[in-house]
Regions:
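Nudix hydrolase/Nudix homology domain
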Residues: 2, 127, 131-133, 137-198
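Active-site segment of metal-dependent pyrophosphate-handling enzymes
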Residues: 98-142
């Protein structure tokens, strides 16, 4: 494991460790694209955060954003200022949920052939991104603080609640953004269970 530091725009210093299995993403996103001979415009990340009760953090998108009122994991595009793809993941987690990453565990193999990464376009369909999602440990799961420009609410959902996209408490629907998000979250639960059973 390697310790990482990065100065965040809000002066928060991101400090986290990561498993060797994700060291491939401990490089600038442009360097990753060049090394892997990819022509996508950029990379994006997602953070799967679980609490002590094995529930996952889901954020509800703002009503005036694309895919309004739908639910997703924290994440977003890498910035040119991000020291690495992993730093981009930790920064997005901080900006969207106010949570500090302490450890990045593994990447979710949600792509074709069981490889990590899902390719998608921006709203106009003119820019292409590949999103890598990671399971991330945080300082305190009880301290979620949303950016109201991006998200309006959050829930901690069980695997069963994600499968039916409905919270038991209050019988509230939690429709996920798309089938890709459903797959990422389901795979995150499966990998976590396999690790705990080992």
């Amino acid at each position: 494991m390697t310790e990482q530091d990065s100065l965040k725009k809000t002066t928060l210093t991101l400090k986290f460790t990561f498993d060797d299995s994700v060291s491939e993403w401990n490089v600038d996103h442009r360097e990753w694209l060049k090394t892997h001979d990819k022509t996508w415009d950029s990379l994006a990340t997602g953070a799967l955060i679980f609490d002590a009760s094995n529930r996952i953090l889901l954020l509800q998108r703002a009503p005036d954003d694309s895919m309004p009122n739908r639910w997703e994991i924290p994440g977003g595009a890498c910035d040119d200022e991000d020291e690495s793809v992993l730093h981009g993941c930790a920064r997005e987690l901080w900006e969207e949920a106010g949570l500090e990453a302490t450890h990045i565990r593994h990447v979710i193999p949600d792509g074709a052939g069981g490889k990590p990464g899902q390719v998608f376009t921006n709203r106009t369909g003119k820019r292409f991104f590949c999103k890598f999602s990671f399971e991330v440990d945080v300082v305190d799961t009880r301290d979620v603080k949303l950016d109201p420009k991006e998200h309006q609410d959050h829930v901690w959902a069980t695997e069963d609640e994600v499968k039916v996209q409905r919270m038991r408490e209050g019988d509230r629907e939690i429709p996920l953004t798309n089938a890709i998000m459903v797959r990422v979250v389901e795979m995150g639960f499966a990998l976590r269970k396999a690790r705990q059973d080992a």
